[in-house]
């Protein structure tokens, strides 16, 4: 199976591209959520894909990169002031494999610092 293969789930082309770009970091697993996608790397939730936009987890450890690029914060609701700790990845970073892997690695570190717990896998008993 490839980096984003999940039975019975169709991935769109952009999600496939994101997964391929992030593959050097570990096991990439996109998961459908709220009309978009959540992206896990080695069971750490690091990103949101909404349309053709990738948003990575941000904290004080990597915020300066996004500020320097003028990258906006993720606002899940157009009619509210709610801002989440994800920022848009600039197109030039997304298209550069070395750069996106570095930015995503920093997002993994941010996710770990924020206390995002790895998703527990349920083991099925075989009788």
Predicted regions and their residues:
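Charge-dense, helix-prone N-terminal extensions
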Residues: 1-127
